[in-house]
Each structure stands twice: as C-alpha cells, then as structure tokens.
C-alpha cells in the first residue's frame, strides 16, 4: 500500500498553525495520474474525508474510486484519518506534512489549496478563518497585534512514506 504525504512549503509572517478549516468536509483538489498506464488527465479532482464510495468487486470503501479511461483499471484514493497536521511557523519555509493519502493505482502530482483554511496569530492567538489560498498567497491585518499577517510563496509536493499508522 503506497501512502503519499502531502507536504506544503510557504512563508508565514505573523501567523502559525495553518490548516484546513474543517478536515471532515475539506475538498482536497488534486491532479491524479494512473500508475498502471501513466495517464495523467489535466483536470482537477477532489476527495472529501466524509464522502465514501464502494469499491467495485470488493468489500472496501474509498474516498475516490475511478476507472482509468485509458487502461480501464479501477483505482482508489483514501484520506488517512487522524493524520492531519498544521503548517507551523517554527519550520517556516520548510517542507511540512499536512495530510496522508492511501493511493492504490493513483498518484497525485499536483495540489490546489482552493478550499477554506484557518490559522492563528503568533502574537495574540487571534484566529483567522476563511483564508482563501486559491492564489497561493494571502494577506490580512491582525487588529490586536497591529501588524500585517501573510502567507506567501506556497508550493506543494507529494512524498512516499511508510504506513503512517504503524509505530
């Protein structure tokens, strides 16, 4: 079972603990490649933790079940619960794991952070909701700290990891 971790790297200024606002209903928008034939459609697909589909010919379920249009293979992707992490300012501008996916026959190769995110002020702990990262940057003002807060230079990558549930 290949597990792929979504890692982000960005520059935070004045905020920390950047994460999806609601991991249960967050839409993880990705571009996916079939690992059997290499078909990589240039369109975005999304998976949601609280949306499960039956896997044909199996007793299993997955967050995404897709039949490859080129080779016909049925592929699945499942979000690994309880593996969500926040992007933290202590490791600013370094790759940090945000989520983990169990990929069978699919390999994510691009991520679009277009759904709502949340973060908090480093100085005051003030929460910032509904952060829109569709442009991969965001700027606001922390009224309590009287300073600008921002997210910039966001990039993403997927890395193969061992089974995240095993110690």
From Swiss-Prot:
<feature type="binding site">
    <location>
        <position position="34"/>
    </location>
    <ligand>
        <name>Zn(2+)</name>
    </ligand>
</feature>
<keyword id="KW-0479">Metal-binding</keyword>
<feature type="binding site">
    <location>
        <position position="68"/>
    </location>
    <ligand>
        <name>Zn(2+)</name>
    </ligand>
</feature>
<dbReference type="InterPro" id="IPR008584">
    <property type="entry name" value="CXXC_Zn-binding_euk"/>
</dbReference>
<dbReference type="Pfam" id="PF05907">
    <property type="entry name" value="CXXC_Zn-b_euk"/>
</dbReference>
<protein>
    <recommendedName>
        <fullName>UPF0587 protein F46B6.12</fullName>
    </recommendedName>
</protein>
<comment type="similarity">
    <text>Belongs to the UPF0587 family.</text>
</comment>
<feature type="binding site">
    <location>
        <position position="37"/>
    </location>
    <ligand>
        <name>Zn(2+)</name>
    </ligand>
</feature>
<dbReference type="GO" id="GO:0008270">
    <property type="term" value="F:zinc ion binding"/>
</dbReference>
<keyword id="KW-0862">Zinc</keyword>
<feature type="binding site">
    <location>
        <position position="71"/>
    </location>
    <ligand>
        <name>Zn(2+)</name>
    </ligand>
</feature>
């Amino acid at each position: 079972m290949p597990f792929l971790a979504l890692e982000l790297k960005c520059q935070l200024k004045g905020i920390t603990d950047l994460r999806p606002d609601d991991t249960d209903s967050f839409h993880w928008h990705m571009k996916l490649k079939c690992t059997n034939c290499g078909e990589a459609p240039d369109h975005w697909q999304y998976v949601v933790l609280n949306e499960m589909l039956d896997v044909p010919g199996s007793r299993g379920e997955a967050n995404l079940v897709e039949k490859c249009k080129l080779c016909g293979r049925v592929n699945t992707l499942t979000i690994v619960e309880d593996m969500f992490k926040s992007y933290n300012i202590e490791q600013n501008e370094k790759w940090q794991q945000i989520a983990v996916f169990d990929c069978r026959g699919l390999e994510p190769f691009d991520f679009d952070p277009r759904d709502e995110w949340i973060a908090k002020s480093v100085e005051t702990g003030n929460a910032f909701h509904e952060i829109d990262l569709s442009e991969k940057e965001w700027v606001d003002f922390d009224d309590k700290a009287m300073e600008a807060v921002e997210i910039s230079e966001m990039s993403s990558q997927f890395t193969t990891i061992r089974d995240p549930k095993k110690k």
